[in-house]
Structure formats: structure tokens, C-alpha cells
Regions:
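A residue-level signal for conserved active-site and pocket-lining positions in enzyme catalytic cores
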Residues: 90, 119, 195, 251, ...
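A short glycine-rich, hydrophobically flanked beta-strand micro-motif that places a catalytic Asp/Glu
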Residues: 25-26, 88-90, 232-236, 375-383
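Active-site pocket-lining segments that scaffold enzyme catalytic pockets across diverse folds
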Residues: 161-249, 293-296, 300, 307, ...
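Cytosolic ligand/metal-binding cores
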Residues: 122-154, 245, 252-331, 335, ...
């Protein structure tokens, strides 16, 4: 059942303020996009998959569940924002067998949830959908009681604010020393010079040890304020939460239209507008960064070509500026030859060279060998798909994995032939500043 609700309701606050200890939830917002948000709470059904075909298998499982889902005809609601009605919310690990270490237990290589309660909002429109799983032998009275119990727990409260105790200093420590990352970059550059590959993305992780359990709600709220142009997301299970702010769209599908973006090439921001503009101009003229951007955009175009009538990329990259960094980005659009499900499109594109490497076959085994870590869902995908197999997923970047009193932050850089290890390490430090000040 889908009903209109006041668009002034903070739907992420409603989800995070109403969660039970055993709940799963997901919030995805892009505040600058007319207050765009798709959020969900509880689990009427769960879809899981693993391995190289996890995107295809997850799409098939969602399709099978959709065939057994009886819903209001949201298509008749011309004002309903995208994401209205029953939706599957979740994401995918970076690697086919990712999220396999204890730190990531609670998530799977692919995991999507059909929420018991979901919200969609954009502009002046908002909708709430209630979904209930019906088993053989369930009584109508019992189903009604379950729905009422869930709705009675909903709270349209404000987000809690970050309020750190100044007397308590969390401990920040890299899971590996910075020199380990620099050595990994050096080895990657050697492989590139040897002709094994053009580019590889290497990540590192940093742990923040707090004095007590870390609540994701105020962190998500702070990210919404600091990064309103980004996809601000929070994925939660009873064991953990993943919270972040990503500047990168993986794919959006609306019928036969698809959109994505090639995002590669990064520099810092400056509080001085003149210096900030100069840094952006340098990035636009950088042969290294434009080459990195070209690798990503050309791969995306080649990937979408076989399933599209046409693919169109912007002639030149543009600057995307967020609070602490600025990137080169090339918007890409496609007219699909047939309505490929958004999850399958995501599987075709993932991992783009912006988070993996080029060629993928050479980068795939090199990344874990040099990084020595389980990326889990970092640099994977987070988002939603509806019963029509439309949807939207972002790349899970600039994120922290929260588990009890530890936050594990991730940051990575694209390594090409002229990469300098110290410069790449410095770039990861800049990217970590998206979340580190909120935790430390």
C-alpha cells in the first residue's frame, strides 16, 4: 500500500529514529536534487547472491519476488517521485566474494531487502509504502496487527546532532602503516610500466576507535549538510552500519533511458576562491588526470554500446566540486536497445576503471594482492530497484564501516604510469577528510 505523506517529513530521520535492534535499513539521499530520498526499514523479504553473476542472480530473484508482489498501481500516480511503491534496497560488494571477513559479517556480496516500510521523496512530493509478507495460514487480523505494530513505532523526529565529548580523543590508526600504501603504489607503477595494465585503483583503510558505540544517524545528518550534491547513504544491519557520501553515480535507469558518469581525477579544494579555481583549472589541464578520465569514460562507452541504440558522452570532462575535493567527470547517457534491468546494467558496468582498473582482467587479481584488505562494500554499489526494474545505484565511496566502537574508513586512488607514491598517499588523506573530522 502506497500513500502520500507530507514532503516536509525527514524520511531518513524517521527510518533511523524508528529502527529496532534487529532491523535492517537503508537511507539514500541527494539533498541538492530537490531533496531526493529513497529509504526503507525492516525486511519483508531478503535477496542474497554471491560470485561473478551476483548482479544477474539478484536481478532474477527480485523479478521473481516482484511477480508475487501485489501493489497499488503507483504508475497511475503522475506525481509520485521515483522510488515510490515497493522497492528493493541494498547493495553489492566490490569483489564477487567480498564482505567475507568478520568485519563485514551481516552483509553479503549482494544483498537487497524489500522493506516493510519505505519512503520516496523529491520536490514537494513524498510517498510511504507498507509491504507485508504473507505466508500460508496467516490470518487477516494477524497481518493487520503486524502492520499496525510497525506503523505505531514510526517516529518523525529530528536527527540527533553530533556532540563529541571534548575530553575524549578517539584513537586513529591505520590498519597498515602509510609506507605499505606507498610501496603498493610503487609496485603497481612497475606493473604498468611493464605493460601489464593501464591503470589500477588501490585503497587503504584507517580505523577510528571511539569511547563507545558509534551511532550512524548524526554522521549521516552531518554528511547531508556537508555534501548535499553527493549520494549520502546509510546501510544498516543488526551488526553494523555503512555510512558515506559518494559523488559518483554508477547507473540510473528509467525505462529505456540510462545514465551514468565517468568520475576520475581528483584534487583538493581551497577556502580561497581564486586558489580553488586555479586548482580546478590545473585539474582540467592535467595530462595525468585527463588520461585517467579517458580510460574510465571509454570503458563505460564500450560496455554500454552492445545493449544500446546509442551512447552519448560529453565532449569534455567537467569539474564536480564537493566540500573537500574536486573531480573530473564526464556525464554519459544511453538509449537502451531493450529494457535491461538496472541491476544487470550495474553488473555490466561494475567495476568501472574508476574503482577497479584497466584492463579489468589484469587489475582484478592485482588489487587484493597489493592492498591486502577486504574492501567489502566499499567501492561496490548501493541503491534501489523497483518492480519495473528501474532504479538507481551509486558507487559506495567516502564511507565508514561502523561496528560497535570502531569506524573503519576507506579511501583509494587511481594509479597510472606517472603516479607518485607520496602524492597518491596524500590524495587518500584528503579523501579521508570527508568522514574523519566527524569521527575523530
Amino acid at each position: 500500500m502506497t500513500v502520500p505523506i507530507p514532503s516536509e517529513i525527514d524520511v531518513s530521520a524517521a527510518v533511523l529514529g524508528s529502527r529496532r535492534a534487529d532491523d535492517r535499513w537503508l537511507c539514500l539521499e541527494q539533498p541538492d536534487r530537490d531533496g531526493y530520498a529513497v529509504c526503507g526499514l525492516g525486511a519483508a523479504a531478503i535477496v542474497e547472491a554471491e560470485g561473478p553473476r551476483r548482479f544477474v542472480e539478484a536481478a532474477a530473484a527480485c523479478r521473481a519476488l516482484a511477480a508475487r508482489t501485489f501493489a497499488d498501481d503507483v504508475g497511475d500516480d503522475q506525481h509520485a517521485p521515483s522510488g515510490s511503491g515497493p522497492v528493493f534496497l541494498g547493495g553489492f560488494a566490490f569483489a564477487p566474494d567480498g564482505a567475507s571477513t568478520p568485519a563485514w559479517s551481516g552483509l553479503r556480496p549482494a544483498q537487497l531487502v524489500l522493506p516493510e516500510v519505505s519512503f520516496a521523496r523529491r520536490g514537494g512530493e513524498a510517498r510511504m509504502t507498507v509491504t507485508v509478507a504473507v505466508e500460508r495460514g496467516d490470518s487477516l487480523a494477524g497481518l493487520v496487527d503486524r502492520v499496525h505494530a510497525r506503523l505505531d513505532e514510526l517516529r518523525a523526529a529530528a536527527m540527533p546532532m553530533l556532540d563529541p565529548d571534548p575530553a575524549i580523543r578517539p584513537r586513529v590508526a591505520g590498519a597498515a602503516p602509510p609506507s605499505h600504501y606507498e610501496e603498493a603504489v610503487r609496485r603497481a607503477v612497475e606493473r604498468i610500466h611493464a605493460g601489464d595494465l593501464e591503470k589500477v585503483v588501490l585503497a587503504r583503510e584507517v580505523d577510528v576507535h571511539a569511547a563507545g558505540p558509534i551511532d550512524p544517524a548524526p554522521i549521516l545528518d552531518a554528511l547531508r549538510g556537508a555534501f548535499p550534491a553527493c549520494y549520502c547513504y546509510c546501510v544498516g544491519t543488526p551488526e553494523l552500519a555503512l555510512v558515506g557520501a559518494s559523488p559518483e553515480l554508477l547507473v540510473r535507469r528509467d525505462g529505456e533511458r540510462a545514465q551514468t558518469v565517468a568520475l576520475a581525477g581528483t584534487t583538493r579544494r581551497s577556502a580561497d576562491p581564486a586558489v580553488d579555481d586555479h586548482l580546478g583549472e590545473q585539474l582540467l589541464r592535467s595530462d595525468k588526470d585527463r588520461g585517467e578520465q579517458r580510460i574510465v569514460s571509454e570503458r563505460i562507452e564500450r560496455t554500454l554500446g552492445p545493449v544500446s541504440l546509442w551512447v552519448a558522452a560529453a565532449d569534455e570532462p567537467v569539474l564536480v566540486k564537493v566540500q573537500n575535493v574536486q573531480h573530473l567527470a564526464t556525464p554519459i547517457r544511453a538509449q537502451l536497445a531493450q529494457p535491461v534491468p538496472v541491476l544487470e546494467l550495474a553488473g555490466l558496468l561494475h567495476p568501472t576503471p574508476a574503482v577497479g582498473g584497466e584492463p579489468h582482467a589484469a587489475a582484478e587479481p592485482l588489487i587484493p594482492a597489493l592492498e591486502g584488505l577486504d574492501r567489502g562494500w566499499y567501492s561496490g554499489a548501493v541503491g534501489w530497484t523497483d518492480l519495473a526494474e528501474d532504479g538507481e545505484l551509486c558507487v559506495a565511496l567516502r564511507c565508514a564501516l561502523l561496528r560497535d566502537d570502531v569506524a573503519r574508513l576507506y579511501a583509494g586512488c587511481g594509479i597510472v604510469a606517472d603516479s607518485v607514491p607520496a602524492d597518491e598517499l596524500a590524495e587518500t588523506e584528503v579523501k579521508l577528510q570527508a568522514l574523519l573530522p566527524l569521527l575523530a
